[in-house]
Amino acid sequence: MSRPSEGDFGVFYRHYISLTRGNIPSELISNHAKDIVEFISGIPEEKASYAYAEGKWTIRQMLQHMMDTERIFVYRLIWIARGDGRSLPGFDENAFAAAAPASHRKLAEMKEEFLLLRRSTDLLIESLTNKELEQRGEASGYPVTVDALCYIIFGHNLHHLEVIMRLYDFT
């Protein structure tokens, strides 16, 4: 296995994949899993309701989005890894965010959920065989491999950590 290449994913995922380090999925876990978890674990409660501009997501909403999206990407990964050839639909992240109001949730509970979700995803990725990683399917109208989905999952999280650090006054 090597890093995903053009044709293994929709071009809109290129940025996510570019944020990752590693040439095989297990290297993604060793290179990124701990940093992602430590960053999320370190978000203080007083920052949870902060949004950097009117109409932008709060950190709490961002975390909910990250969890929802990871679950969707993992579902795609399992679907394709298990050989189901049917195309998977896309999703509207803003509609999902509006339908899953996070403002009532306790940040500590969200962090715990995120940590458990991340660990579950890592265990799933570690269990994949080369045959499963090579499986190809379609999601959101674009071809995607299971291998590419591993990179997309990590890259999506890294993208949002970068956004939080850059725009959410998080130091």
Q: Whereabouts are the PLM-identified features?
A:
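A short, mixed-charge helix-start or loop-turn motif at secondary-structure junctions
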Residues: 18-22, 100-104, 142-146
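Terminal targeting/low-complexity segments that flank the catalytic cores of oxidoreductases
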Residues: 1-34
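Amphipathic, non-membrane alpha-helical segments in soluble helical-bundle scaffolds
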Residues: 22-33, 56, 60-63, 107-111, ...
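Short, contiguous alpha-helical
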Residues: 1-14, 49-93, 119-122, 134-171
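Acidic/histidine-rich alpha-helical segments that form the ligand environment
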Residues: 27-41, 96-134
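A glycine-rich, hydrophobic loop/mini-helix early in the fold
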Residues: 31-57
